[in-house]
């Protein structure tokens, strides 16, 4: 179960970083 949460967080973080990169 914890691994699933970690995977979700990683996905969210990646999405957030991608958005930040696109803005720059």
UniProtKB/Swiss-Prot annotation:
Q: Name one GO cellular component term.
A: extracellular region
Question: Looking at the keywords, is Iron present?
Answer: no
Where is this protein primarily located? secreted
Question: What tissues express this gene product?
Answer: Expressed by the venom gland.
Q: What organism does this protein naturally occur in?
A: Cupiennius salei (American wandering spider)
Write out the similarity annotation.
Belongs to the cationic peptide 04 (cupiennin) family. 05 subfamily.
Localization, per the record, is: Secreted
Spell out the molecular function terms from Gene Ontology: toxin activity
Name listed for the protein in its UniProt record: Cupiennin-5a
Q: What keywords were assigned to this record?
A: Secreted, Toxin
């Amino acid at each position: 179960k914890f691994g699933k949460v970690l995977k979700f967080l990683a996905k969210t973080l990646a999405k957030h970083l991608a958005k930040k990169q696109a803005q720059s």
